[in-house]
Swiss-Prot record:
InterPro entries: Ribosomal_uS19, Ribosomal_uS19_bac-type, Ribosomal_uS19_CS, Ribosomal_uS19_SF. Keywords: Chloroplast, Plastid, Ribonucleoprotein, Ribosomal protein, RNA-binding, rRNA-binding. NCBIfam families: rpsS_bact. GO terms for molecular function: rRNA binding; structural constituent of ribosome. Protein S19 forms a complex with S13 that binds strongly to the 16S ribosomal RNA. Belongs to the universal ribosomal protein uS19 family. Pfam families: Ribosomal_S19 (PF00203). This is Small ribosomal subunit protein uS19c.
Amino acid sequence: MARSLKKNPFVANHLLEKIEKLNMRAKKEIIVTWSRASTIIPTMIGHTIAIHNGKEHLPIFITDRMVGHKLGEFAPTLNFREHARNDNKSRR
């Protein structure tokens, strides 16, 4: 479901504070976060945010086309390997 337009997009407070500090200092550092539910806002453009996928942090460079999406959309949590092989020779 989409979030109501009356409400502002959700961005974790600690993440917003880190981005504002870096924007004031005009620095570009990697920001580590576990907040996959945060929405990407225009102030994040140009920053690299390391998003947790359950095992490690994946660094993602934020571009203008990502605005409005959630951070978790860019860090997949499941890596499908392949189905088990159907080995008919060993069954005979």
